[in-house]
Amino acid sequence: MNLPIVKGEYRKDYNLKHLTWFKVGGNAEIFFKPVDSEDLASFLVQNKQKLPITTFGAGSNIIIRDGGIEGVTIKLGQNFSNIGFTDDGHLIVGSSCLNFSLAKFCQVNAISGFEFLVGIPGTIGGGVAMNAGAYGCEFKDILVRIEAIDFAGNFRTFTNEEIGFKYRGNNLPKDLIILKAVFKVNKGNSEDILARMNEINAARSSTQPIKERTGGSTFANPEGFKSWQLIDKAGLRGYRIGDASISELHCNFMINNGNATAKELEDLGNFVQQKVFEDSGIKLNWEIKRIGKVSSRAWLDHGIQRKIIK
């Protein structure tokens, strides 16, 4: 495999497990951390072989399958996490900035409207991509525009309207890497903002298994329903496949109890989908992203294939 000449770092057969919150999954065939946007653009322009590209954020809302990821997995590092202000007074934030870090920056600088980010694991880029939300707010409510690059190496800008936000998603082209996000600035009171952040943290601590190996909410809420209630009603609280289980504390969270495989987690989610559909007639849609190849070894080890709703 002839890789493009870059300033950043390549690693072959790179273990991604330690980068994910679930602590499961296989290796990246090629792992690439660009130095800056120009380095990333150079890689994309030179990618004449059209090597498959996968982008990787904080690893919080993702299952990497046990067979790993083919092609090049791109992770934007600290050089893509800066926070600053535009000439017209908006916030401009690198896509690899953690949601919590932006929430804290806004609290210190008395900027309101970002408190909900303290309750959402992951990065700004990932949050924009899935229109993440919690406690009555979503990214679409605060975003002005994004700066991105497509897989051909072209820099592009999309306004809030052009992004086409929807519940836990958007209508952006699939061959796009978000580089920066620009947000509205509304002044507030630092003490009031901190109080609200503390409320959110307290609520999370009491209702979510935040100290476990988990990936956040497993399923998006169907319109008019709460996923956790449907899962609980189907009798699946605490249900277990191998070392993967449904949280006793919050039924819309899966947990790796120590040695779960990615297949066990994905099988558990698919089984929950099936049982909820049988119980209520409602299909739950995955909120956790599943990427990579299924390992043939995992199929042999697990032994059972479960029916998956199409």
UniProtKB/Swiss-Prot annotation:
GO CC list: cytosol
Extent of the signal sequence: none
Pfam families: FAD_binding_4 (PF01565), MurB_C (PF02873)
Organism superkingdom: Bacteria
Enzyme superclass (EC): oxidoreductase
HAMAP family reported for this sequence: MurB
Name under which the protein is recorded: UDP-N-acetylenolpyruvoylglucosamine reductase
Gene symbol of the encoding locus: murB
